[in-house]
Structure formats: structure tokens, C-alpha cells
Curated annotation (Swiss-Prot):
Keywords: Monooxygenase, Oxidoreductase. Residues 34-129 form the EthD domain. Belongs to the tpcK family. Induction: Expression is regulated by the aurofusarin biosynthesis cluster-specific transcription factor aurR1/GIP2. This is Dehydratase aurZ. The keyword Magnesium does not apply. It comes from the Eukaryota. It comes from Gibberella zeae (strain ATCC MYA-4620 / CBS 123657 / FGSC 9075 / NRRL 31084 / PH-1). Pathway: Pigment biosynthesis.
Length: 152
């Protein structure tokens, strides 16, 4: 018998089946490779890595793929926006988000030989994977294009 029970194994295989209007969001709070400047990091992420992976994401039905680059230039903007209740500034270099209908779509993409041969190995060129963290959760949108999104 395996050291993991069926319950433990299936808990890592969650999907959103049965919830057709629910999207899942994988968020990576990313740090750049220490040897790169902010400019080099952003260039590699947006001009090299995104170009490698975006066509695969489209092919596998990924709904959205975004990056928010936090730089020396943008970080001071927070002081215009924050209040005492939310005053802790994050030190991530980038926040990357992937929105998909089912985690199986993302897993199929990651298993594609093109991903394994070109995309996955590229991470060592720009990412500090020891410091970067990830989380996954349900994606909810309340305002889009300046309009309230109708909810039940």
C-alpha cells in the first residue's frame, strides 16, 4: 500500500468540474535572478519568455496570462495609494498570473514537449525560483473595462 491515502492523492488533483463559470488563478510572486537588472529581467520576461509560452497558452485554452512588474520606478507610487491599514510594501519583482477554466488545461500545456524543451529550461535565465512563491485560487472579477460585472 502506498504511504499516501487516496484522499491525499486526490486532494492534489482538484479541478473545477461542476462549476462551469468558475475560473482558477495561479499567481506567482516572482523574484528576478540576482545577476539581472530590472530592465534586463522585464525585457526577458516580456520579449523572450512570454513569446515562448503565449502560443502554447492559447492552444491549451488558458484564458489570461499577465505580468505586473514592480520596479524602482513604480514602487514609490504605493505611497500615494496606501493607508495605515495596508502599509506593507511587497518586494516581489513581478507578479505573474495565469487564469484557466480547469487545472488540467495548464497541466496538459506543461506536459507538451515544446514546453518541456523550450519554456521550462528558460526559467533559469531570469527567475530566482528559490525565492519565488506560488498560490492558486478561484478567480473572481467585479469590474472589467470600467464596468461592474453583473453577479447573481
Amino acid at each position: 500500500m502506498s504511504p499516501h491515502s487516496d484522499t491525499q492523492e486526490t486532494s492534489h488533483e482538484a479541478t473545477v468540474t461542476g462549476q462551469p463559470d468558475t475560473l482558477v488563478c495561479l499567481t506567482i510572486t516572482a523574484y528576478k535572478k540576482p545577476s539581472l537588472s530590472e530592465k534586463e529581467y522585464r525585457h526577458h520576461m516580456t520579449k523572450v519568455h512570454a513569446k515562448l509560452v503565449s502560443p502554447l497558452m492559447e492552444e491549451y485554452g488558458i484564458v489570461r496570462y499577465t505580468m505586473t512588474h514592480n520596479t524602482k520606478e513604480t514602487r514609490p507610487m504605493l505611497y500615494q495609494l496606501y493607508d495605515p491599514q495596508f502599509s506593507n510594501q511587497s518586494d516581489y519583482d513581478c507578479i505573474v498570473q495565469f487564469i484557466f477554466k480547469d487545472i488540467k488545461d495548464f497541466l496538459r500545456m506543461k506536459a507538451d514537449p515544446r514546453f518541456l524543451e523550450k519554456v521550462a529550461p528558460d526559467h533559469v535565465n531570469f527567475a530566482d525560483t528559490k525565492r519565488s512563491t506560488m498560490t492558486v485560487g478561484y478567480y473572481e472579477e467585479f469590474v472589467n473595462d470600467g464596468k461592474v460585472v453583473p453577479k447573481d
